[in-house]
């Protein structure tokens, strides 16, 4: 764009901005001019004689002039039937001009990010959406979400954010965030002032620059227009971000402000959603050669003001920027919106408009865009058109455009088109549109009808978009159709089930590349070799199936009906991520080091000692623990001292310490159970099976609770022989009492049955009624089993009631039983009884260690001088916005007060008052009324003049 020193003719140009009908308009203004950034097509000129762009005395030698070839000769009016291709010419290269970036940057302050007049300015009003792309690492670069990919976010003009998408960190759809600007130079032209030149070849849709400046509200925009005019600033750099928000790069911005106007542009301006902000960028509209000037169409509308000369020199140049010469030719809608409406594609729109201008159907001066577009019949919607419709609908704020876009979706009856709508974030975008136009019943009915037509297989996308929360209030609407359709839709959604989706495998870019010839062969297969294969309509859909086990499988969204927040992926080797109680991310490594900042280098991994060294260290630690925790046992003379040599361990013994108490108690319960079961087996014929199992579980849990309560457990994975002996004695006493109680209950039951059945044996007695000495036998058996052996252990026998008649157990049998008891293996220290839990714990422990506590809150790092200056400037901008808004509110209140006062005076004049005094008063009243009315009229007229002078469409 022009800046700095200009020729006399060029100083008449100006840049300004159109308010509501344009998608990011921009203009260069002198006095009162309105402009739009939308690259509207440029038809041929009719009915207006075009003055030459240069006066005769302004001609220069070809070697000295930097003007384009057509600047010296007036452009001839193209023929109606002339082809658009015939009007094209070879692009002009400006490689001979020097780079004057340093000089150009002296006319404004260079800033790297937009300054916002308030925290809520520039808000995108869109929820974060996930793309379905997979990570694609080649070397150190993630090639996912590229230009040729089918990335949903890229198609809908949204950038991916690390941690929120499946594509991994550092994908190709982060151009705004990384400031991946094109290589350009600033040149100084003869008539257009400063401009941008491409230093390298650019492809279609390449990102050139973000348009950066101060984001201000409408009152500040109006006041700055007046202020700049008084200061003598001839070139304003305003861009419309939303209906009431503007980007002002007049005094603060970047090199994007130097992009000039052309009637045949090679660039276009578009808005993208980046995180929670709406940002504006300049993109290549076609293939651009190195040395070309970067230009886009301002599409200025001057609202009756004198048009400014256009020096672009293109064959289709209208000769002017602004005025009726340009603005009556077509709508100010951008090409993307025109294509989304299904009127014409971007290439044929210029031709269609040129033909339309010469026919009676040309756009009238009083005709708006809606009336003009209504003359054209939209095309049918196909799968490719869905992408354009959804991208435009996501940022649409004009109701009439939204109605037409929704109408195209509503009339689509192809299942492939509807599936494409769902894939392109259909539920999220329709929810946003519903919230934007929820006051309009017709728009709401359109959206409800589209939602009902969309294919419904699972509830995943419906739940993820949270669209049910937007539809629920409509069930209580006063409009009968809205309420009924909302209830019908919610009822259909309630019948759907949430399908379980296997999460994608996260690729580690630092992992070594493994070759798999089988997978390579599969990837190289040409799928087009089988044209006869029928097309599966469910190929791209996940059809829900039944659960694979009795355990119900549920989606992560089942709980709390919320989408879980995804943790950052692709961290450097050795680093892990988790969240604190407030949901903030922090990072840690295996050594327990924590930090808030995302790590950029692999963690320092302490070398693991060898197995032998580790065993020796463990053995030494066990000796120290045994000496500090237990007193040295005193051995009697007749006892052989036990060896103090520790049993080698594999290093996994102490992993139970990191487990919670509940898991430790479960491990200890499994450790005690073999000893409890050993005693239980001796009573399997003396107690019913179910009672025996129940008693075993109860006594086991009772022992665990008692030992933990009295702090008798040092290691839940093993117990000493002394503990085992006490446990067996306690369990045996418990079961002896249980047997006695069981027999007493049986006897009471037999007595209640009557004398006739008293002699019959009890079926549940297990044969105890066969011997009249059953009770005594049990007592004798108890006495026998409580006799300690030579080692002091309790020897349990299989003596039963009916076994009293059998001979006593021989001494060899007793020795064998003692040997078997001594050979009962204690649970291995490294083995956890549950194989499933052992597998899970080992996997978890080996892959991701338990997260340590979060680091202390980060200290506020001191701001640099530049950061402090930017913060002060942003605070000053906020105060300016607030002051401008306050003044406008006061002015609006004053106008309302004047209008009310004038109406009251006019009413008193009509009523009239008799008498001389009243007569004089009534004569004076009209004067006041007229004066007030003139003031009000003058205010309104002044307001209208301001609206004409400023690029705001009322």
From Swiss-Prot:
WW domain segment(s): 569-601
A GO-annotated cellular component: nucleus
Gene3D superfamilies: 2.20.70.10, SET domain, Set2, Rpb1 interacting domain
Key words, A-Z: Chromosome, Coiled coil, Methyltransferase, Nucleus, Repressor, S-adenosyl-L-methionine, Transcription, Transcription regulation, Transferase
Bias kind Basic and acidic residues: ranges: 1-31, 519-532, 865-896
Domain AWS: 126-180
GO MF annotation list: histone H3K36 methyltransferase activity; histone H3K36 trimethyltransferase activity
Comp. bias regions, Pro residues: 849-860
SET domain mapped to chain residues: 182-299
Protein name: Histone-lysine N-methyltransferase, H3 lysine-36 specific
Source organism of the structure: Neurospora crassa (strain ATCC 24698 / 74-OR23-1A / CBS 708.71 / DSM 1257 / FGSC 987)
Family per similarity comment: Belongs to the class V-like SAM-binding methyltransferase superfamily. Histone-lysine methyltransferase family. SET2 subfamily.
């Amino acid at each position: 764009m022009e800046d700095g020193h200009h020729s006399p003719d060029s100083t008449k140009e100006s840049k300004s901005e159109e308010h509501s009908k344009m998608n990011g308009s921009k203009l260069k203004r002198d006095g009162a001019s309105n402009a739009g950034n939308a690259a509207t097509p440029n038809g041929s000129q009719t009915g207006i004689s075009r003055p030459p762009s240069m006066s005769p005395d302004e001609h220069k030698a070809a070697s000295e002039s930097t003007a384009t070839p057509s600047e010296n000769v007036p452009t001839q009016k193209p023929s109606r039937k002339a082809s658009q291709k015939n009007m094209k010419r070879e692009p002009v290269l400006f490689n001979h001009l020097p780079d004057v970036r340093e000089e150009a940057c002296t006319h404004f302050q260079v800033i790297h990010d937009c300054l916002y007049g308030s925290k809520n300015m520039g808000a995108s009003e869109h929820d974060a959406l996930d793309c379905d792309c997979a990570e694609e690492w080649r070397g150190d670069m993630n090639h996912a979400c590229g230009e040729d990919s089918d990335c949903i976010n890229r198609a809908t003009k949204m950038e991916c954010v690390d941690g929120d998408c499946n594509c991994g960190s550092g994908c190709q759809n982060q151009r705004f965030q990384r400031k991946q600007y094109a290589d350009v130079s600033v040149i100084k032209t003869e008539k257009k002032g400063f401009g941008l030149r491409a230093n390298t070849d650019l492809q279609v849709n390449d990102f050139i620059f973000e348009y950066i400046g101060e984001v201000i509200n409408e009152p500040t925009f109006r006041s700055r227009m007046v202020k700049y005019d008084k200061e003598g600033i001839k070139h304003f750099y305003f861009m419309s971000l939303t209906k009431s928000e503007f980007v002002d790069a007049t005094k603060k911005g970047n090199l994007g402000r130097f992009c000039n106007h052309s009637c045949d542009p090679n660039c276009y301006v578009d808005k993208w959603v980046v995180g929670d902000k709406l940002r504006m960028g300049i993109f290549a509209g076609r293939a651009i050669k190195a040395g070309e000037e970067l230009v886009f169409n301002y599409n200025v509308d001057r609202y009756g003001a004198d048009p400014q000369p256009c020096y672009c020199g293109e064959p289709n140049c209208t000769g002017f920027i602004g005025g009726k010469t340009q603005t009556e030719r077509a709508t100010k809608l951008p090409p993307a919106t025109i294509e989304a409406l299904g009127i014409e594609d971007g290439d044929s729109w210029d031709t269609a408009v040129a033909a339309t201008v010469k026919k009676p159907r040309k756009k009238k001066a009083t005709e708006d865009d809606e009336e003009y577009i209504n003359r054209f019949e939209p095309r049918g919607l196909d799968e490719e058109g869905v992408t354009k419709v959804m991208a435009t609908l996501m940022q649409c704020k004009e109701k009439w455009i939204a109605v037409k876009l929704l109408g195209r979706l509503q009339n689509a009856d192809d299942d492939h088109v509807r599936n494409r709508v769902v894939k392109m974030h259909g539920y999220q975008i329709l929810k946003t549109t519903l919230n934007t136009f929820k006051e309009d019943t017709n728009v709401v009915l359109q959206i409800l009808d589209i939602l009902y037509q969309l294919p419904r297989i699972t509830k995943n996308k419906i739940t993820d978009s949270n669209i049910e929360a937007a539809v629920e209030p409509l069930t209580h609407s006063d409009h009968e159709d809205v309420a009924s359709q909302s209830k019908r839709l919610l009822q259909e959604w309630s019948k759907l089930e949430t399908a379980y989706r296997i999460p994608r495998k996260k690729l580690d870019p630092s992992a070594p590349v493994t070759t798999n010839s089988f997978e390579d062969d599969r990837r190289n297969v040409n799928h087009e070799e089988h044209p006869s294969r029928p097309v599966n309509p469910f190929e791209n859909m996940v059809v829900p199936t039944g659960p694979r086990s009795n355990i119900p499988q549920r989606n992560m969204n089942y709980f709390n009906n919320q989408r879980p927040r995804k943790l950052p992926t692709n961290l450097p080797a050795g680093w892990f991520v988790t969240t604190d109680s407030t949901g903030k991310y922090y990072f840690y490594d295996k050594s327990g080091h924590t930090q808030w900042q995302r790590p950029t280098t692999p963690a320092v991994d302490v070398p693991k000692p060898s197995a032998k060294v580790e065993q020796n260290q463990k053995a030494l630690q066990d000796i120290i623990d045994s000496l500090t925790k237990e007193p040295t046992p005193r051995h009697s003379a007749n006892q052989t001292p036990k060896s103090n040599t520790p049993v080698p361990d594999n290093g996994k013994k102490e992993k139970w310490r990191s487990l919670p108490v509940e898991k430790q108690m479960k491990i200890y319960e499994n450790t005690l159970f073999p000893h409890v079961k050993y005693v239980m087996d001796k009573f399997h014929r003396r107690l019913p099976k179910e009672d025996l199992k129940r008693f075993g579980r109860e006594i086991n849990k009772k022992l665990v609770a008692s030992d933990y309560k009295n702090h008798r457990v040092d290691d839940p994975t093993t117990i000493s022989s002394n503990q085992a002996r006490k446990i067996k004695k306690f369990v045996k006493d418990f079961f002896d009492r249980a047997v006695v109680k069981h027999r007493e209950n049986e006897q009471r039951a037999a007595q209640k049955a009557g004398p006739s059945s008293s002699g019959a044996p009890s079926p549940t007695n297990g044969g105890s009624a066969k011997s009249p000495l059953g009770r005594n036998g049990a007592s004798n058996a108890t006495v026998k089993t409580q006799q300690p052996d030579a080692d002091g252990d309790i020897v349990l026998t299989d003596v039963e009631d009916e076994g009293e008649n059998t001979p006593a157990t021989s001494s060899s049998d007793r020795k064998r039983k003692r040997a078997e008891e001594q050979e009962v293996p204690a649970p291995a220290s490294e083995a956890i009884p549950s194989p499933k839990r052992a597998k899970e714990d080992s996997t978890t422990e080996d892959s991701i260690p338990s997260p340590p506590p979060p680091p202390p809150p980060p200290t506020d790092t001191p701001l640099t001088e530049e950061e402090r200056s930017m913060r002060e400037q942003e605070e000053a901008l906020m105060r300016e916005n607030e002051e401008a808004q306050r003044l406008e509110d006061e002015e609006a209140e004053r106008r309302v007060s004047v209008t009310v006062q004038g109406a009251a005076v006019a009413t008193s004049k009509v009523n009239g008052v008799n008498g001389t005094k009243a007569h004089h008063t009534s004569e004076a009243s009209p004067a006041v009324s007229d004066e007030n009315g003139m003031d009000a009229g003058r205010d309104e007229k002044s307001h209208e003049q301001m609206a004409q002078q400023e690029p705001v469409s009322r």
